[in-house]
From Swiss-Prot:
Plants overexpressing CYCD3-1 show extensive leaf curling, disorganized meristems, increased leaf number, late flowering and delayed senescence. CYCD3-1 is a highly unstable protein whose proteolysis is mediated by a proteasome-dependent pathway, and whose levels are highly dependent on the rate of protein synthesis. It comes from Arabidopsis thaliana. Phosphorylated. This is Cyclin-D3-1. Belongs to the cyclin family. Cyclin D subfamily. PANTHER family: CYCLINS. Residues 354-363 have a biased composition (Basic and acidic residues). The gene is CYCD3-1. The keyword Cell division applies. Involved in the control of the cell cycle at the G1/S (start) transition. Activates the G1/S phase transition in response to cytokinin hormone signal, but declines in response to sucrose starvation leading to G1 arrest. Involved in the induction of mitotic cell division. Plays an important role in the switch from cell proliferation to the final stages of differentiation during plant development. May not be involved in the activation of cell cycle in the root apical meristem (RAM) in the early phase of seed germination. Induction: By cytokinin. Induction by cytokinin is blocked by auxin, but not by cycloheximide. Induced by sucrose and glucose. Induced by 24-epi-brassinolide. Down-regulated by sucrose starvation. It comes from the Eukaryota. The keyword Cell division applies.
Length: 376
């Protein structure tokens, strides 16, 4: 036994010697730390907006992919004054709800992109004002499912001064209609795609880069609220937005940075000038600032809470009445909300509310038929 223990101890010592041979001395650790600190200070002291070409070659393929996927939407239908006004109201509601739940800027941009592409591909009737609100709820719900990790219930989306309250099944069927209209392409190229690409190339080395990113997102929230920007390519909107932010951050020498940016994006000043001039005409981005501040506050509050409260106007949602054999489309009279009379001015009937106080805040709940997803 003693001999065996002695052999085991010798084997352990030999193994320890082998492990010791793998270690190396690091006497210059302090010097290396000083060198790294010096290099970081030099990099942070240099201009935060210079994009070095040698750092960008490896991401050129990503940029080419973005350009190949972006498509000119050409939404000329928004030239309609009435539709443009309705869109402004719908976009405002989307931004308010987006901030209410603390969703990201990308979620808001995606929702509005879905909205624009849908309303220009599908004929909405002006005598049914609830249609656009239903589309807005469905677009924001889809965008939240794509971008967010915590998504409210469909009934819970209907907050922030909503005029109508739709049942969950109604919203789901509108989601299906939007998905089929967009050919199930949910990860669309948006201006944020190009802004985030440039920021990723900068590497977010210092606070200036973060500030640049936040300012771009804030301005984009104001830009997408204006229907005049709908027809521009996402890359053009992104370039014009970043050029404007560069001008605000460094008013003394913005031209060189703007030229560098356009060179990276392979865009000419002439192609961006019209969009850039429109941005200059926008008022101070109070909308974007307010929405972004509210969004950040709400995101913090919702991160600490695992449940989302329903709006006070939402009550029991029973399956909406419908005719299974109906093949009517949007334009059919059966799509009208049920009323107690034939008068088109009368609102749909209300379901019973919980509590006496909620009776004072009743909102019309629309019961739409199954034919809501039928294409015209």
């Amino acid at each position: 036994m003693a001999i065996r223990k002695e052999e085991e101890s010798r084997e352990e010592q030999s193994n320890s010697f082998l492990l010791d041979a793998l270690y190396c001395e690091e006497e210059k650790w302090d010097d290396e730390g000083e060198e790294v600190e010096e290099n970081s200070s030099l990099s942070s002291s240099s201009s935060p907006f210079v994009v070095l070409q040698q750092d960008l070659f490896w991401e050129d393929e990503d940029l080419v992919t973005l350009f190949s996927k972006e498509e000119e939407q050409g939404l000329s239908c928004l030239d309609d004054v009435y539709l443009s006004t309705d869109r402004k109201e719908a976009v405002g509601w989307i931004l308010r709800v987006n901030a209410h739940y603390g969703f990201s800027t990308l979620a808001a941009v995606l929702a509005i992109t879905y909205l624009d592409k849908f309303i220009c591909s599908y004929s909405l009737q002006r005598d049914k004002p609830w249609m656009l609100q239903l589309v807005s709820v469905a677009c924001l719900s889809l965008a939240a499912k794509v971008e967010e990790t915590q998504v409210p219930l469909l009934l819970d989306f209907q907050v922030e001064e909503t005029k109508y309250v739709f049942e969950a099944k109604t919203i789901q069927r509108m989601e299906l209609l939007i998905l089929s209209t967009l050919e199930w392409k949910m990860h669309l190229i948006t201006p944020i795609s190009f802004v985030d690409h440039i920021i990723r190339r900068l590497g977010l080395k210092n606070n200036a880069h973060w500030d640049f990113l936040n300012k771009c997102h804030r301005l984009l929230l104001s830009v997408i609220s204006d229907s005049r920007f709908v027809g521009y390519l996402p890359s053009v909107v992104a370039a014009a937005t970043m050029m404007r932010i560069i001008e605000q951050v460094d008013p003394f020498d913005p031209l060189s940075y703007q030229t560098n940016l356009l060179g990276v994006l392979n865009l000419t000043k002439e192609k961006v000038k019209t969009c850039y001039d429109l941005i200059l005409q926008l008022p101070v981005d109070r909308i974007g600032l307010q929405i972004q501040i509210q969004s950040s506050k709400k995101r913090k509050s919702h991160d600490s809470s695992s449940s989302l409260n329903s709006p006070s106007c939402v009550i029991d949602a029973n399956p909406f009445n419908s005719d299974e054999s109906s093949n009517d489309s949007w334009s059919a009279s059966s799509c009208n909300p049920p009323t107690s009379s034939s008068s088109p001015q009368q609102q749909p009937p209300l379901k019973k509310m919980r509590g006496a106080e909620e009776n004072e805040k009743k909102k019309p709940i629309l019961h739409l038929p199954w034919a809501i997803v039928a294409t015209p």
